[in-house]
Amino acid sequence: MLYEKNADEFLPIASTTKIMTAMLVLERCDLADKVVIPPECADVEGSSMGLTPGETVPVEDLLYGLMLQSGNDAAVALAVHAAGSVEAFAARMNETCAALGLTRTHFENPHGLDAEGQGSTARELAVIARSAMENKTFRQIVATERKTIGGKTYVNHNRLLRDYPDAVGVKTGYTMAAGRILVSCAERGGMKLLCVTIADPNDWADHTALLDWGFAEHRMFEGNGIRYVLPVFSGRAQACAVVPKTAPRLLLRQGETPKISAALPRFVFAPLKKGQSLGTLTLTAPDGTETSVPLVCAGGVPFDEALPLSFPEKLARLWRLAGRALFSFNFQI
């Protein structure tokens, strides 16, 4: 978290609710699925795709209408298709909140129209958006400026896609009770920032300023080139290179450097497989933020049958044999 203000205040979040709706539909439905528009769509208020009960529309088209046009009718159609009813779908939304560890978010419907007890916090809405943005199809939809479906062209309500060069998503929201809500995401120089404001009448300007500040004052440290060497006993090589399984990344303020620490054994025994996990690499920012990745063997080291075993190797083998014997004995009991 780079900046926060009243991040845990529970508030209505209007159509940004549809971030969760789209995420669940993408998990449960195929894009090519055909949805028969249910009669419930005729009674939905607010922004609309203009769907007609009884017509058939693919899930993919409904998702674009949901996230670009903010169609409340699309939200209902998708909810009924995915779960059988709006109520059942809302229950799935709340189950997903629990799975994400969210304790101050509750949904009563899939579109975000005002409902008693429905809402979230800026912090938890950011968690939902971050989770949704992990889905490639979701990212593609929310980054789309306009989409023509059935002869109608829908323009994304997210103005930042046109006004902020690095914007890549995600969703606007508004009701009289909730005010203006905006969840935005922008990417620059390998760094992706997510911004959430609730009940902010100056959201476009505030998001532009916050994103500019975030990119100017922070950088993404990438731990490329980190490498360790461990002694190897009983191998055809006397040492093996150990590298991060994936390049570790940590967001830092400009001018900061991370603490780099590795949890590794003092030596290892052959045989070793390429990619075998040998330890953990941890990057720690000055504020205590951490990220960890596995450290793995960069190349395989086969066992050398011609080498005599050293005392530590004999001891290690005896220990392993004793462990297997103990396991076998316990298993027989």
Where are the language model's segments positioned?
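Domain-terminus/edge residues, biased toward the C-terminal soluble/receptor-binding domains
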Residues: L102-H106, D114-I333
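Active-site-adjacent loops and short helices of periplasmic peptidoglycan-processing enzymes
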Residues: M1-R123, V127-K136
